[in-house]
Amino acid sequence: MSEKVKFEKRESLKEKPDTANLGFGQYFTDYMLSVDYDADQGWHDMKIVPYAPFEISPAAQGLHYGQAVFEGLKAYKHNGEVVLFRPDQNFKRINNSLARLEMPEVDEEALLEGLKQLIDVERDWVPEGEGQSLYIRPFVFATEGVLGVRSSHQYKLLIILSPSGAYYGGDTLKSTKIYVEDEYVRAVRGGVGFAKVAGNYAASLLAQTNANKLGYDQVLWLDGVEQKYVEEVGSMNIFFVENGKVVTPALNGSILPGITRKSIIQLAEDLGYEVEERRVSIEELFNAYDKGELTEVFGSGTAAVISPVGTLRYEDREIVINNNEPGKITQKLYDTYTGIQSGKLEDKYGWRVEVPKY
């Protein structure tokens, strides 16, 4: 990829939405970043272009054989400064996903530079309200128009931007209801569970819909072999507080290595909490609850940062955790994490990356 980013200016700019009613993924900025790949040139022709529909061959391999990966990260505005949060980790992870699907890896530094230039162009789209952000969606898909199960020789990478509202609509964390899925599985070891590939999310929709019909917000996935060990919840990693310890399932190849998860573990340790990464069975959790040892449960991910779990149902039993209220450790981790993101707290880790004015 070239570090020089071309800029194709659009004739007129969009009217920006009311920041009081942004929601998530509903609005998109004026421009997007585009990069092409072919077997002869590699990644090339990085440019900032108007956000608009584009043509693709009906035979594009990504539509038929699933070569498609994506990422999700955010930019924040504080006192006029626009910053990214750990973007290097997202581009490392997208390369891991690309490698797993036999897709060409990207130049992480060049892509980050292109993203910074895109966000600088769209600086006025970054909302500054409490909990608001500019959601960033990089994605790569196969474009070669030929049928046949093999790796494509052509790909396109796009980065689109979407101003997003506060996940909870304010500062107060809201607990979720979780259904433990014991029929379908999300991933198996040796598969693509550790990668952020489009098919993982498509495969989760049926179980998610079934859980919603029963009155639950998300699904807690169990392992794909014995269906007894906890893996992750919905589109988030999962944490438990047992006997004052912060416990999370160890990465095993079928769990997405969340960047929020990684950050939460480091923050928890630095705040003095004991953290355990290990196998956690669903039976252990319900036994711990019966003994009064399971006091908090929460998920972690880019969208919500931290999402407290207030209700957990497995088979015919439902338990209520901490009276459906966020626990003290959950709240402390959320406040610390979002404080660093927003610039209200010191960033001693170097996680915030400023977007310069070009």
Swiss-Prot record:
Modified residues (N6-(pyridoxal phosphate)lysine): K196
Function: Acts on leucine, isoleucine and valine.
GO BP terms: isoleucine biosynthetic process; L-leucine biosynthetic process; L-valine biosynthetic process
Cofactor: pyridoxal 5'-phosphate
Protein name: Probable branched-chain-amino-acid aminotransferase
Signal peptide annotation: none
Catalytic activity entry: L-leucine + 2-oxoglutarate = 4-methyl-2-oxopentanoate + L-glutamate; L-isoleucine + 2-oxoglutarate = (S)-3-methyl-2-oxopentanoate + L-glutamate; L-valine + 2-oxoglutarate = 3-methyl-2-oxobutanoate + L-glutamate
Protein family according to the UniProt entry: Belongs to the class-IV pyridoxal-phosphate-dependent aminotransferase family.
Classification via CDD domains: BCAT_beta_family
Pfam families: Aminotran_4
GO molecular function: L-isoleucine-2-oxoglutarate transaminase activity; L-leucine-2-oxoglutarate transaminase activity; L-valine-2-oxoglutarate transaminase activity
Enzyme class: transferase
PROSITE patterns given in the database record: AA_TRANSFER_CLASS_4 (PS00770)
Pathway annotation: Amino-acid biosynthesis; L-isoleucine biosynthesis; L-isoleucine from 2-oxobutanoate: step 4/4; Amino-acid biosynthesis; L-leucine biosynthesis; L-leucine from 3-methyl-2-oxobutanoate: step 4/4; Amino-acid biosynthesis; L-valine biosynthesis; L-valine from pyruvate: step 4/4
Keyword annotations of the record: Amino-acid biosynthesis, Aminotransferase, Branched-chain amino acid biosynthesis, Pyridoxal phosphate, Transferase
Originating species: Staphylococcus epidermidis (strain ATCC 12228 / FDA PCI 1200)
EC numbers, comma separated: 2.6.1.42
